[in-house]
Amino acid sequence: MRFTSTILLRVAVLLSLGGGSQTTSCTPGQPFPIPAYSKTSLQQTFEQIFETVSRSFDNESFHSTNVAIEVTSSQETLWSFYHAAKNQSSQDGSTVIGPDTVFRVARVSKLLTAIAILQLHDQGHISSLYDPINIYIPDLDPSTVQWGRITIWDLLNNVAGILDMYGYADIYTDFSARQRADLNLPPVPEDSLEGMPACQVDKSIPCDSAGLLSWLRSSRAVFEPHRINSNSNVGFSLLGILIERITGIDYERFISQTLIEPLHLNSTSFRPPHKNSGAVLQNDHTWNWDVGVNNPSVGLYSTPRDISTLLRWTLNESPSSLLNWFAPGFYAVGSHSLIGMPWNIFRTTAPLSIPNRPTTFNTVVGTLGPYTSVVVVMPEYDLAVSLMMNGALGHPHDILAKVTFPLVRAADKIALEKVRDNYAGTYKAEPRQKINSSITLSVSPDHGLYISELISNGSSILPVMERLASSKSGGGSNWIFQAVPTFLETKRRRTPHDRVVVNEEWRWTYVLDKPPGEGWNDWCLSSFDPVTYAGEPLTKMVFQKDAKSGRVLSVALSGYNITLPKGVQEAGIFAQLEGTSLDLHAQAGQEVLAG
């Protein structure tokens, strides 16, 4: 029996209530499974990046600069670029730059601290990330700072509203008299220096936790807690003290035992190696500077090889089974920036130049003296980039764009081609099913995989649903029914023909093809489960794939209670799949919404 208009109207009403009128700027992200790369799949892109980056570093302003860039997937390092300073007299360390050259990696140190905190929380040593920090460090009080309102989560996300740095970054102690004079700052009486930390006045004295806590008790807040994002290296120093209080182990030893050694980061430490193995500038005192209690935020020394190993771990693992480490926790400055633990998250449509397809970059960036380090993680593409430099750089916007933008474009093309080859096509009922039903899935750069045709028992469903959904939404007729992976796999079953089948779940949603950026068109409400039929989700599709080859064999439409083989299959493919289809609530061959 065919769909009746009453049934279609009810479905359309439920869809419009469940998800709202979504415009193309609300197209779901991650329109493909996580891609994989071969040794050659990105080769042409890397050749282009090499030429572009090489030209940049040929500039005279970089003649006294050492540079190391690596790109890795979750499986292996895919590409590297090393640039040694042409002016070798500017260097006091190694004049050959490679994967094992040691750099000071500044705020990239925060990655290890954040991982350690999240693991301790996962293991139950920290009861809640929303615990106030003064529960664990009571000697922060008494203070004018509201430590009872500042949580571990606030410190991880840099929204505690507290001071940024301790023991450095003070113009009086870190600038020369000439530089201070150029700023026309007033003279400072000698007795006013008595309140400054001893480790700031004399850099040969490492800053310690007792001095930090004493200094914080007399400090004042920068902002009200969890009101606005403002970087705080001091916050990560407190997280380092928290680790020590919980574990009874020195921060540096704990990080070494739980992360550096298990991950075989053999050239990573909190102590400077011999300068002959490092990227060290002539007359630079930062290389050997012991930052003490600031180690959790800026103290680490590491190599491109080790950082790529760490980034591979972040792509493969999560420090927490309870949360998505890459997800944002708070707003940052600007319309494209968010904050995470400890990420600075940048979302932009610039790489793909498609208004509804933003790319998310999880970054950590920082400098310490002449050393600059950046890591960029792109989880949806299974890629990460590290950049380490000593010498001239400024903010690394330009170099990052030259590396990441063409990389994202190439990775996106690979991912969509994989979707087209594996999932796109027509899935049609076999004659033995005795029903005229099919679904056609297509691929576009804007929307990834989408339903371009749906036939139920001889009736074309999408045009009717588009019209009815439009009448309920108040405008627009060009609806796109986009499918996205859920990253859920259901049962693996072995068929009578000894074929192992994987059931891979996807969901589809609908967006209205209106231009973004007009009025409230960018206001997005998301639901991938807006309506069910007899308890089965209408928007659920389950692809049945051969576990060995990865080839898609069929798709099961849960709400319609039917499994449709893909395209031209070998004889009897549906019979081979019997016993592997989903346990739906009606017999195979019946469509639930057909009567």
Curated annotation (Swiss-Prot):
Keywords, sorted A to Z: Glycoprotein, Hydrolase, Signal
GO molecular function list: hydrolase activity
Induction: Expression is induced on squalestatin S1-producing YMG medium.
Glycosites: N59, N87, N266, N436, N457, N561
Domain of life per record: Eukaryota
Pathway membership: Secondary metabolite biosynthesis
Record keyword GTP-binding present: no
Entry's EC annotation: 3.5.-.-
Family listed: Belongs to the beta-lactamase family.
Function: Probable hydrolase; part of the gene cluster that mediates the biosynthesis of squalestatin S1 (SQS1, also known as zaragozic acid A), a heavily oxidized fungal polyketide that offers potent cholesterol lowering activity by targeting squalene synthase (SS). SQS1 is composed of a 2,8-dioxobicyclic[3.2.1]octane-3,4,5-tricarboxyclic acid core that is connected to two lipophilic polyketide arms.
Protein name, per record: Probable hydrolase M10
Organism of derivation: Phoma sp. (strain ATCC 20986 / MF5453)
